[in-house]
Structure formats: C-alpha cells, structure tokens
UniProtKB/Swiss-Prot annotation:
Binds 1 zinc ion per subunit. It comes from Natronomonas pharaonis (strain ATCC 35678 / DSM 2160 / CIP 103997 / JCM 8858 / NBRC 14720 / NCIMB 2260 / Gabara). This is Methionine--tRNA ligase. The gene is metG. Homodimer. ATP binds at residue 350. PANTHER family: METHIONINE--TRNA LIGASE (PTHR45765), METHIONINE--TRNA LIGASE, CYTOPLASMIC (PTHR45765:SF1).
Length: 698
C-alpha cells in the first residue's frame, strides 16, 4: 500500500506516446492535458515530480504512411515529432522532457532492457507462422495485415483487435488475413522470432494487479488476461524500421527489429533520465524513481503514474510491468486510463476530415484553458467525453464566465475601488473552513486519481463565493456597517487567491493572470496548496475580466468551417468514385478464394433469436451481455456492441445468431453463441417478417 502524495520519493507522470504519423486533433489531446493537470496538482502538494513523454517513431503505421509519401520512415516521423513539440505548449501542456523513441538514449536503454531479459533466460526463440504477401514477397507485421479477431470475430489489425475485444494479437493469430499493401489474401510462412516469457511473471502480475492504483478500468480489465495462462509476447518483427534486436552473435536475430511495444514504454524511462541529466541528479534522480532497489531487488512500486487511453490498458498493466520486472526496474504505482473523445456526438474521422484539428483550435484565437476545462470536466475520466463548439460555448459561458469569472470580477473590483486592494481585516471562520474543505477535496482528487475533481474545485469554491457575497450584500454594508463590509470583501479576496491556487492545474494561463491581478510576487505555478490561505497583497490594481463570453456568431462561424470541410471531403470521395468505371466498395475485404462445401455450411446452426435483455459488462469498454430466446432455450451471448447500440431499446428485437458455436469466455463472462452483424457499426442482422425465435436460417 502506497503512502498518500506527497511522498519523499520523487515521482514521474507519463503520458502515452503519440504515434508520429499524423496531425493532432483535439481528441488526441485529452491524455496530455489530463497528464499536465495531474502533474501540476502533484507539484502543488509539494511532490517532486517530472512530467515526461515522447513521440513514438517506430512501428508499421509510420512505415506504411512513409512509404505512401515516398520518404524514409525517420524523416517522416521526425517531421511530426517536431510538430508535436510546437503544438503541446500552445495548449499549456508543459513537459519537463519530451523525447522520442529513436534517439540514442532510448535506443541504448531499450537494448539494455532486452539484454537483461536474455541474461536471465526470459527470452526464447520460436518458429512461428507469420502473414506473408506472396505478390510483394515480404512479411506482413502488425498493421501491414488486417483480418478477423480469433477471440471475438470482429475486424482487427495484425497486432490488436482495436474494434472488438481490445486484445493484443500475436503474429499468426489473425484469421482471414489480408495484405494492406496489395489487398490480396495473405498466406502464412514459418519464421524464427524472439519471445518474452510472460509466463515467468504470471504470479508476480497477479500480485501487481492487486497493488495497482489508478482508475477502475485499469485495475479491473487486466484480471481477465492474467487469470488464464499468459501467452509469451513476441518481441521482434520482420522490418527494417525500428531498433535492431541485440542479437549478441545469434545470427537468427540480426534481421529483426524490436516490436514497437517494446521500445515505446521504455521511452518513459529514457525521457525521465534525460530530464534528470538536464537538471542534475541532485535536483531530480531518475534512478530514485525507476531503480531504487534494496539488496538488488526492486521494491513493489515506484512513484510512477501512467496516464493513457483505455485502448492500451493491456500493454501498460500486463506487458509493461513484466518488462520492468524482468529488467530489475520498479513497477508503476498507478495507471489512469481515459475514455475517447467524440466530436459532436460521433467519432472523429480523420479520413473524412471530420475533426477539429489542434491547429483549428489555435487559429480560432480561443484561450487554451477553455479547451482544457471543457475536456477535463466534461465527463468522468474513464468515460467518453464529447467535444463540440456549442458545448465549449455553453460550459465556458455558464461555468467559467457566469460562475468563476463573475465572482472574481465583482469581488476584486469592489475591493480595489473601495479599499485599494485587500481590506484590513481577518478571514472569517466560515470562509477559512470553506477554503480548507476545498483544499481537502483537491488533495483527495489527486490521491483518488480523479482529474475531473481538479477542474471542479475552483468553480465550486467560486459558487460558494457568489452565494456568500450575495448573502451579505457588502454594497449595502459600506455605509450601514463598514467593518462588516471590510470583513466580507476581505473574505472574498481570500477566496479569489484560493481559486488562483486551485485553478492552476487545469487553468494555468488564467490562474497566472489572476495571480498577477492580485499583485502577488513570483509565479502561481510555483505556489503550493497552502498558499490558498496566505494573505494576499494589501494593494492591487483594478482587475480585468478574466473570461470573455463566447458569442453565438463566433461559434456559428467555427461550426460553418467544420461543416464545409466535411462536405468538401465527402464530395471529393464521391468524385473519386465517379471516376472509376467500377468503383470498389469502401473498406470491404475481398471475397476469399477458398470456398467451403455446402455440407460445411449446413454444419452451422443459424437461428432467429429474440433479445430478452441487454446490459453492459462492467469494466469492459465495448462488450455487452445479451439474454436471447432461441426457441428451445434462453442463451447468454456476449457481443462488442456496447458503444454502438442503445442496449435498452434492443429488448424484443429479432436478430440472427450462430447457435452451435463453442462456448467462450469474454471478460470473465460466458458466451454461448454469436450474433451476426455487419460493418464497423455492427448493424444487426434481422428478419424482414416476424420469424419466430428458433427458426433456422437456411
């Protein structure tokens, strides 16, 4: 059990590495804004902390996109890495160090990790079946191949079931493989590869999950994966782009590079080391975070907090702790996994240009803190959050302008005009208690890993401030009871200072402006939480309004620009289709050349079923549990439709299911059959007429 923050041991906060293969949009930024806010909050508690990340320069997505543009992968990735370095600060995301996986530090650190695994016999070579494109005469690692997930039947990429059960897929597991290079069905060929023996860490991982702190989804999802027998992790790929496997004279390893999910998380360590070297180990010692061993054995956990998207929980709670343990490094203290960001109720679509790009927001002239507040407070951290210009306007005008800004401006303006600044009076017990309660809530939010609570803290205190000033009406007291008027305004100025301190993690730019308005010395970014109760300066100038109301015409223009861009992209798609004599259907897999016999088809027991009940599976992102009537009995089926259908409305729907499929267990829930659905949106197969449950599909 970890002690609460702050701790004497330094901490590190990391964010999942962005792939250096495309422009950033506001959906991507949720992880990094949240990580920045959490690191700032730790600092305000007096915690020594480094906030680090870096660009993921390797892997098949970058190799694929670089080849399409006719450039080498390194040049392609460096261009986006440099773009990210410029973009993050424009959203007040201030990394202590932002590196990349292809630099010298990470290359050597990664090889050091792998050599440790080799020396301790955690690496084994196996002959495995890998996807191969016969026409291109090359292997198809990871995203060079697509097909069907063997676990849930959804469309999947070569290394991940990204649209279904979220499982990591090993080379050779994907079914009905298709090359993304030529579009042809792939074949399988035998190749030697290196594996990390995850089975060596099975018992350790079970204990690790029990110790792990963070969000519930990161604590619960891994239990399914580690309760069964862990499969060894293939750590090499047949590619030219990446960090070479350190073969150490083993000829079979010389033409292999390391899997991207080996060197990517190791960048967390490398980036921390780079920061330590910049400031000096006397100020921040990276090994005190990652390698503070006792008698050569790492402790159960360092003060390491990973902030990621919920689609990479398995990598950070199963693979990564095993990798750390095998190399003698500390395990993470916490993993915080956030939901996705939707755009006005629907998913972002970069292919359709249906996105608000980071540059769009910057060019809009809107303050970055408005986005930070909207995305952090818009939902609980583990849930999906919606971004829209209309939603941003509503939350800004209601909460930041109407509540926070209104209290600050009316109270500080009254204080400056009537007293030249802070009135000469003591803070009342009522207000001191309210500020102390807000500080306690802030500390709790940090230690409970509730980023949303950090955003709510200053607004809730401002809500109290508005009620307090309205209740006492100091404008009436200046003549009738001047001493009481001074007391009320003194309290309000103290609340304003407390708001500046509490708001700094989520609204760093606006908090700095408020700090300056109060005439404070130094920077609010260096202030610790206790400063919320320290006396403000005696004098300050007339304040400016901290927040500007977002007018309808401004938001309408931003919406118009987005709609025009989407329409232009759609029109371009249609024009491209018209130019083809036989336009191919988008995103459809070719019909398999291999045919099955009619007898094989008859072996499938396909029936009409009626949905009796549908409910989400707790802790699973996409899975739902359905009770269905198949005529002869009621069955339970698990399907990846949680995010795609209104489960409450499915009761009574007639669907089509495969009834004689072997039973499977998904996320700890038994599934006895499979429903049939079409496309990425899982359109359910239904019947035109009212076929009774149990009717066989011929």
């Amino acid at each position: 059990m970890h002690e609460e923050f702050p701790t004497e041991t330094p901490a590190v906060v990391t964010c999942g590495l962005p792939y250096a293969n495309g422009d950033l949009h506001v959906g991507h930024l949720r992880t990094y804004v949240s990580g920045d806010a959490y690191a700032r909050a730790l600092e305000s508690l007096g915690q020594s902390v480094a906030f680090v990340s870096g660009s993921d320069m390797h892997g098949t997505p970058i190799a694929v996109n670089a080849a399409e543009e006719g450039v080498d992968p390194e040049s392609f990735a460096v261009e986006y890495h440099e773009q990210y370095e410029e973009t993050f600060p424009q959203f007040n995301i201030e990394f202590d160090n932002y590196g990349h996986t292809h630099d010298e530090t990470n290359t050597e650190m990664t090889r050091s990790f792998v050599r440790s695994w080799i020396d301790d016999d955690h690496v084994v070579e196996k002959e495995i079946e890998v996807a191969w494109d016969a026409e291109a005469d090359q292997p198809l690692p990871d995203r060079f191949v697509e097909g069907t997930c063997p676990y849930c039947g959804e469309k999947a990429r070569g290394d991940e079931c990204d649209e279904g059960c979220q499982r990591h897929l090993e080379p050779g597991e994907i079914e009905a493989p298709v090359s993304t290079i030529t579009g042809n069905p792939a074949e399988y060929r035998t190749r030697p590869h290196k594996f990390l023996r995850l089975s060596d860490f099975q018992e350790y991982l079970r204990g690790f999950i029990d110790r792990l702190e963070g969000t519930e989804n990161a604590q619960n999802q891994p239990r399914e994966w580690i309760e069964g027998e862990l499969q060894d992790l293939c750590i090499t790929r047949d590619m030219d782009w990446g960090i070479d496997y350190p073969a150490d004279g083993d000829e079979s390893g010389e033409d292999l590079v390391l899997y991207v999910w080996v060197d990517a998380p190791i960048e967390y360590v490398s980036s921390t080391k780079q920061y330590s070297e910049q400031v000096g180990r006397d100020e921040y010692d990276w090994e005190a975070v990652w390698k503070n061993q006792v008698d050569g054995v790492p402790p159960e956990g360092g003060e390491i907090v990973h902030i990621i998207g919920h689609d990479i929980i398995q990598h950070h709670t199963v693979f990564w702790p095993a990798m750390l343990r095998g190399a003698g490094f500390n395990e993470p203290r916490a993993v915080m996994a956030c939901g996705f960001v939707n755009l006005d109720g629907d998913a972002f679509s970069t292919s359709r240009n249906r996105a608000v790009w980071a540059d769009d927001y910057i060019e809009s002239g809107l303050h970055p803190d408005l986005y930070r507040y909207h995305i952090i407070t818009g939902s609980e951290f583990t849930a999906d959050v919606d971004f829209s210009w209309d939603g941003l306007q509503e939350r800004t005008n209601s909460e930041l302008v109407g509540t926070l800004g209104n209290f600050l401006y009316r109270s500080l303006l009254f204080a400056e005009r009537n007293y030249g600044g802070t009135p000469d009076a003591a803070v009342s017990d009522e207000v001191r208690n309210e500020i102390e309660a807000a500080m306690a809530d802030f500390r709790t939010a940090v230690n409970d890993y509730r980023v949303r609570g950090l955003g709510r803290a200053p607004v809730e205190l401002a809500t109290f401030g508005n009620e307090y000033i309205q209740r006492h009406e100091p404008w009436k007291l200046t003549d009738d009871d001047p001493e009481k008027a001074r007391q009320v305004i003194r309290d309000c100025v103290q609340i304003a200072k407390a708001i500046a301190v509490l708001a700094e993690p989520v609204l760093p730019g606006k908090a700095a402006a408020l700090w300056d308005q109060l005439g404070e010395d130094g920077s609010v970014h260096d202030a610790e939480l206790g400063a919320a109760l320290e006396s403000p300066p005696e004098a300050f100038d007339e304040p400016d309004e901290l927040f500007e109301k977002l007018e309808d015409d401004r938001i309408e223009e931003l919406n118009r620009q987005l709609e025009e861009r989407i329409e232009a992209a759609d029109a371009g798609d249609e024009e491209g289709e018209d130019e083809d004599e036989e336009p191919p259907a988008a995103d459809l897999e070719p019909v398999a050349d291999e045919r099955i016999s009619f007898g094989d088809f008859q072996d499938l027991d396909i029936r009409v079923a009626e949905v009796l009940e549908a409910e989400p599976i707790e802790g699973a992102d996409d899975l739902a549990k359905l009770a269905v009537d198949i005529g002869v009995e009621t069955r339970q089926i698990v399907a990846g439709i949680k995010q795609l259908h209104d489960l409450d409305s499915l009761s009574g729907t007639r669907i089509v299911v495969v009834a004689n499929l072997e039973k499977a267990e998904l996320f700890g829930v038994e599934s006895n059959g499979m429903l049939l659905a079409a496309g990425e949106q899982a359109d359910l197969l239904t019947t035109l007429e009212d076929a009774e449950p149990g009717t066989k599909v011929q």
